From Swiss-Prot:
Keyword set includes Ribonucleoprotein: yes
Oligomer status and interactors: Part of the 30S ribosomal subunit.
PANTHER family: 40S RIBOSOMAL PROTEIN S11 FAMILY MEMBER (PTHR10744), SMALL RIBOSOMAL SUBUNIT PROTEIN US17M (PTHR10744:SF1)
Biological process terms in GO annotation: translation
Function of the molecule: One of the primary rRNA binding proteins, it binds specifically to the 5'-end of 16S ribosomal RNA.
Keywords tagged on the record: Ribonucleoprotein, Ribosomal protein, RNA-binding, rRNA-binding
Origin organism lineage: Bacteria, Pseudomonadati, Pseudomonadota, Betaproteobacteria, Burkholderiales
Organism of provenance: Paraburkholderia xenovorans (strain LB400)
Molecular functions (GO terms): rRNA binding; structural constituent of ribosome
Domain of life assignment: Bacteria
Assigned protein family: Belongs to the universal ribosomal protein uS17 family.
rRNA-binding as UniProt keyword: yes
PROSITE patterns on file: RIBOSOMAL_S17 (PS00056)
A Pfam family annotated for this UniProt entry: Ribosomal_S17
Protein name according to UniProt: Small ribosomal subunit protein uS17
Amino acid sequence: MNDSVKTSLKRTLVGKVVSNKMDKTVTVLVEHRVKHPIYGKYVVRSKKYHAHDDANTYNEGDLVEIQETRPISKTKAWVVARLVEAARVI
């Protein structure tokens, strides 16, 4: 038998939680840098994703990793996989 470790083929992204006002849902802002095709300057592009947070544990400012999953609702097809870094409380 072959004892190989299964790896997840689902996409994962890292972003910042910008809203946790919905029940069991967080809004995650994912930013990435893209080089402008003509000018060559690096520009920051961003997109917001709704991710499933079953226990309502993540707060605004947390850095989280989200993973693609089956559609949970009309706008939600991602689930929070893990907490990368907690938000600083001042």
